[in-house]
Amino acid sequence: MMMLLKRLYSVLCVMALYCSAAFAQVNIWEGTVGHKSVEMTPFLAQGSGNTAIVVCPGGSYFWHDTTTEGYDVARWLQRNGISAFVLRYRTAMVPAFVTHFRYVVRGNRYPDPQDDLRRAITYIKARADEYGIDSRHIGAMGFSAGGHLVMSAAELFDKDVRPAFVAPIYPVVTMTESCVHKRSRRALLGDNRKNNRALRDSLSLERHVPADCPPVFLVNCMDDPIVDWHNSVLLDSALTAHHIPHKYIQYLTGGHGFGASDTKGTAECRQWKAEFLKWIKMLNL
């Protein structure tokens, strides 16, 4: 009887581990030149050969909403059999927002977030067996500025580290058009490069959709008060013009910043989670 109880306790401990972050935070740049400290937190689904998603919270490229657009998203994915990795990619941070010190020193800016996401995908692929993941089925999901980040990975990364699919949710897209989210542009480009036309163009994602772009799941709300919904329209038009497999959902209500919350936004916009799960099953990963 005692032996049975001990075994039951061990099983419960393992289950509890998988119901939270199955592994402690990891520094994806540890052991590399410069020893950059960029943390990623795994939330592993049970089993092996799972699909995985790198979750990139939003925050205007200045900061992160790690709760609603990070850990809550990861737990929801984990409950649905998808392993998730919340990436705290480098951002410009609050002091840069307040002081404009990046006119004098570099600070964090492009391509730092993209380098971090590229490194995260490489890191996960190298440990796919350990994490119980199919290395061919690693996607990326991002919110707001994080949506720009994951879509830039779909367009700009080499094929060996490109996500298998991406889900930009109420994303920042353009850096040039009138609907640009200026705060994100300033954070990503840097104070002394925010008016550089060539750089703006290179990071306006509606202009650079490749013919072999991975599948895209795109969501926005027409009452978004933060990122103009025309950003998503620009991306949808570009994906359609290039015949890229994608699903675009435009909700009338929901605003911005609802992430995977069961209470934020509206009942209408919260349907995106069920729609995403249907969509990812249709990909037959």
Write out the residue ranges for each language-model feature.
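C-terminal catalytic histidine-bearing segment of alpha/beta-hydrolase fold enzymes
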Residues: 33-34, 38-41, 95-102, 233-285
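Short beta-strand element of the alpha/beta-hydrolase
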Residues: 50-58
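Short beta-strand/loop motif that positions the catalytic acidic residue
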Residues: 212, 218-220, 224
